[in-house]
Amino acid sequence: TDYNIVLLPHVLMPADNDLDILETIAHEKKNERIRLLFEHLSAAEYKYVISKAELCIAARTHVTIAAYSSCVPTLAIGYSTKAKGIADDLNLEEYVIDVEEDKLQQKLEEQFLKLYKNKRQLKEQLKGKIPQYIQNATPQKLLDFLKEDMR
């Protein structure tokens, strides 16, 4: 690919550590276009990095949410029903791959090419859907409180 690739660990727990697999990928590929970003970033900084991506491939729900809410076309690797449910809400269900999928690597490659091909359309689709999605997800009482606080 001609893309620069940022590997961004999200979960760093002893029993469930993204850094382990991402270090393995970065080491095996030995490509200067692949960068493992492992600085202690705040949630806002992580979201900023994700928002600057042209495309996103993610297996963590919070990463997909950060990408979707930043209108970044995303291929979600789902390990739970949450990935499919969120994508369904945005009419992006065809861009979710079950981690248990047969021929996972082949499916990832096919879906990535589809994501790449349709990236402009998907970005516009997200721009059209995300504001309403956020409004629907935010309780009206909170919105009213925030409006009051801003006066």
PLM feature segments, named:
Residues T1-R151:
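Active-site anion-handling motifs in enzyme catalytic cores
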